[in-house]
């Protein structure tokens, strides 16, 4: 038996990366998982490969009506909702590690277009707000449940290379705490997870920029550059994986985690200890 047997979970942004890792672990623990993602084709493919019967569909989670319709479809098909994971989000790493070029969502505040700021807050904070808003009535109908919000260690401190992303993720952490207190009487637990260094498309872009602009990395592959950063920057000297995040999300959403709410837990190999 798994920790999540008989439960129904929704994972936003679950087609690949962290979201796919969360969906995979939750399915292995017995949950039926629905994946909502802008890339509906990949969402369906990922869902088809889960350990339990899954569902994958296209959905833009920063739009309330499509999100409402998608979650309603999940509830109609699976019979309810117990777990909602607000994972969808995006960060734009500045291509230049000296932080001298404007790069949309990354770089200096003075170089950032207001539209880029708004986009980052929509993708990372508005999406979490809407996911919570849509999920709560269904969780109440089940007598309680779990909301897990994927934040970032960038939201725990200063991130001069990613001001909009960091501000949005700090907002996710604050929203998680406020929601935890607000919905505790309804037996709904809300927690945030703050991942550290994972090999994602954002990190691949940053490592590619470092390869082009840092002489010592000129002959290195982006993946090797990332692992060098991990070696020098992570006390445990190892990268974090989507499955690492998935195991914590599953634990927080299981009966074992029934007394944990309003927390922001780092899965970062000790980065934030420094």
Enumerate the language-model features and the residues they cover:
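Residue(s) in the substrate-gating loop at a strand-loop-helix junction
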Residues: 152
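Active-site helix of classical SDR
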Residues: 132, 168, 176
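Alpha-helical segment proximal to the catalytic Tyr-Lys
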Residues: 137, 181-182, 258
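Short, small/polar-rich loop/turn modules that mediate ligand/substrate recognition or access, typified
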Residues: 184, 189, 260-262
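Short C-terminal tail/terminal secondary-structure segment
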Residues: 157, 236, 249-250, 256, ...
């Amino acid at each position: 038996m798994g920790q999540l047997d008989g439960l129904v979970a929704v994972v936003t942004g679950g087609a690949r990366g962290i979201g796919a890792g969360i969906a995979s672990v939750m399915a292995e623990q017995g949950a039926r998982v629905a994946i909502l993602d802008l890339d509906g084709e990949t969402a369906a493919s990922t869902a088809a490969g889960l350990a339990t019967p899954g569902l994958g569909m296209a959905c833009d989670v920063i739009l309330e009506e499509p999100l409402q319709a998608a979650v309603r479809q999940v509830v109609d098909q699976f019979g309810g909702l117990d777990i909602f994971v607000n994972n969808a989000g995006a960060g734009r790493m500045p291509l230049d590690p000296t932080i001298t070029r404007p790069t949309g969502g990354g770089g200096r505040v003075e170089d950032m277009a207001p539209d880029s700021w708004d986009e980052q807050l929509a993708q990372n904070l508005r999406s979490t707000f809407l996911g919570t808003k849509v999920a709560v009535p269904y969780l109440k109908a089940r007598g309680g449940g779990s909301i897990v919000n994927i934040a970032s260690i960038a939201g725990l401190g200063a991130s001069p290379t990613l001001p909009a992303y960091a501000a949005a993720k700090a907002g996710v952490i604050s929203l998680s705490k406020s929601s935890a207190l607000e919905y505790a009487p309804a037996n709904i637990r809300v927690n945030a997870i703050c991942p550290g260094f994972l090999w994602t498309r954002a990190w691949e872009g940053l490592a590619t920029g470092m390869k082009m602009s840092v002489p010592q990395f000129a002959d290195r592959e982006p993946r090797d550059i990332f692992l060098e950063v991990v070696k020098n920057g992570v006390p445990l000297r190892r990268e974090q994986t989507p499955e690492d995040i998935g195991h914590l999300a599953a634990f927080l959403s299981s009966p074992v985690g029934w007394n944990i709410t309003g927390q922001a837990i780092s899965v970062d190999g000790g980065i934030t200890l420094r």
